[in-house]
Amino acid sequence: MNYNAQVLRSFLTRLGYRAADVYQEFRFAAVDQPSRPVRQVDAAAFLDGPASYRTAALGVVRTDANETVQQTVEATRSLGAPFLVVIEDDEASMWTYTASGVTQLDSTSASQWQTLLADHKKFGPGPIRLLKALQVREDVPTTGLLFDPRTLYGIQASTQLALDELLTQFLSHFDGARTTAGQLSLQTHYEVLFPLVFRLLAGKILIDREDNRISSIDPDDPRQVVATVETLYSLSPQRLQWTKARVTQLASAWLALREGLYVRNVAADDLAFVYENTLITPETRKAFGTHSTPYSAADYVIRSLRLPEGNAAAQLRVYEPFAGACVFLTAALRRFKELFPQSWTVDKVHEHLVSHFVASEIDPFACEIARLALILADYPNHNGWRITRENLFESNHLADRVSQCDVLLCNPPFEDLDEPIEGLSIHKPVVLLNTVIKTPPAFVGVVMPSGFSTHKVYREHIRHICEIYADVEVMLLPEGVFRHASIGAEVLIAQSRRGDSIIGEGSSDESTIRKSIVRRTDWSRFTQTLKTSSSDVTQVNPRTSPGLVALRPLRRIWDYLAESPV
């Protein structure tokens, strides 16, 4: 059988994959298995760098002696490749992953394994890229190849759980209940420890990915790892007195991190969720009104927007006020990488992103964490992210920033202003809505307080939004999904700005309005599939049916009575 490293690389590059994106003996963590073992495929092709389950396209592997073909396929799910060729003895078979499980697509003799992937119109980078780009308003995959891109959200959920456990274990070495005199304590030194976590995570990524930029250092020395990461990404050195007790403490924590989850195939932007999920403190939430954004909610918003592709996507300016750890911006970063011209180099994409993606945040600590999160999300590129520390409720900052963006994404604080400011509502969410109505961006995705769609405080704002945009959705999220906050929330998604020639939509007098609901019992499913529990959709004329009136529970009864003779 013609099956060796050179043949594998040559075949995958002929399909259209860049040589730099084809790997032999690629190792990855099987995050969907309890022990998260490190698995290996003989070859893997990726859409672009860095290699991760999000960019994986194809895999080729031989079965282990103690596994069946189906067991091998199931154990390889976390690679993230839509298609896997498995060779067992004299037979080769091709498999894919669906929402209901693994599915065999074809088979042939082992000597003819290349014929299973020979059609570049199906298995080249372009078709695979489209296949993995999930649109949440599509009920079923648009391909005849069966692969369901929602499968990737199952991998994402498993990955984020594994990362949470990894970092919780790391931070346990700094638990004040366990530390001794002179050691670092999470309760006392969290403003030092949290940035340290990100520096060490970046170092672990570089080490697990065998990055040449870190190959010359001693990987067992965490302080050397931190110093190297700070140099690579132009980060300010941490000022901390390293006593013998602290050095010993850090070495023990770093060992747990080093020997924990193998992160080579982890999508770097998954690490951005760590701040809001694992690192946000009750003190920070109380001081700045921070309520962490579920990553799946941010993904749902981004993938609900009908963003243009190619050069048109490159014209859009994206802004996240009240950014926290930039969960929305990192989700947008991932989506826009799918939309940019495929001819763009990695350097070109990075250069464009740092000039068109900006954020604002009042918490200085969150600003640093957000910048570190974006650095990790944009691995292996350099720094350059613009995270401005500012109080957006002062000096008309919010209005100025929103007027300059095309895509507005955020989770604002829900609290009232401490003191009244002339010209502004005392309710912070209302201030944001007033700004959107005054200078409406082309695309809007913002989190609002629970009751937004029904409370009289927001009635006029919703009416204006439905007049400005021809496509409006409100998604209701259950209580308990915002970490460190017991309240639920509603997400406003607005697009198809009327009279917008660039987007090419919104010229009709009618609007499409949606009300989607995610029930508490369905939250786990939503995080893995982005499927809501229910969605009510209708077409209305916003002048005769203002706001969300058409989606009220008794709408169909009133419509029937209006059309029926008495």
Where are these regions (language model features)?
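Short, basic/polar, glycine-containing "phosphate-handling" surface segments that engage DNA
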Residues: 2-200, 253-269, 470
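Conserved SAM-binding loop
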Residues: 370
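Signature of N6-adenine DNA methyltransferases within the class I
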Residues: 4, 82, 86, 91-95, ...
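Residues that flank catalytic or metal-binding motifs in active/ligand-binding sites
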Residues: 353, 388, 488-490
